[in-house]
Amino acid sequence: TKENLNFSGAIYAGGLDSGISEKITLTLKNLTQDMFKSKGGIYGGSKGSTEGALVKDGDIEINISNSHIYADILGGGGAFGKSSKVKAKNTKITVSNTSISGYENNKNTWTGRIFGAGLVQGGALFEQESTDVVINNVDGVTYDQNNGEVSNKVGVRIYGGGQNYKAVEDKSQLKIGSTKVTINGKDTALAEVYGGSIISGTGNK
């Protein structure tokens, strides 16, 4: 039930070091801010966590509505194990009438984010055929980590692709075939929108 839901880490709609060959569907609605104990990630696909893992997902569909979420939303899964490979086919994300929030700390801002694809790091490979992100009346705020108060109504960041989080000497690879982003709604508030992906971390040069 709603009263028993609490999220303190990542949510994966897929498997652990094992993919789902048929379609994955994740539906979230009427979630509230107090269900999230810390800022995490909501992944539509599977997680590759061990060295050399090979994970293959089919199509992925994510539907989120009427919610207040303190997390990043990622259409694909996550590839973390060294030399692991996580692959997915086509992702469709629809987010409606929802707030996706982040936090601020020492003048650094991490907004809530929507990624059409997944996340890769630690020398892994993430590959996806296509993404399709549709938003309707989506906004977001940031919270001051020191006092928990709203510090900025900056909006949400949207990436049609995924995230390659690199450390120094990290050879992680992120490959996305095509992306599509559609923005609707008079109440939508956006910090930034990118059709592609982001490379971040200490090894992002």
Model-identified regions with their sequence ranges:
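Surface-exposed loop/turn motifs in large extracellular/passenger domains
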Residues: T1-D72, G78-Y194, I198-K205
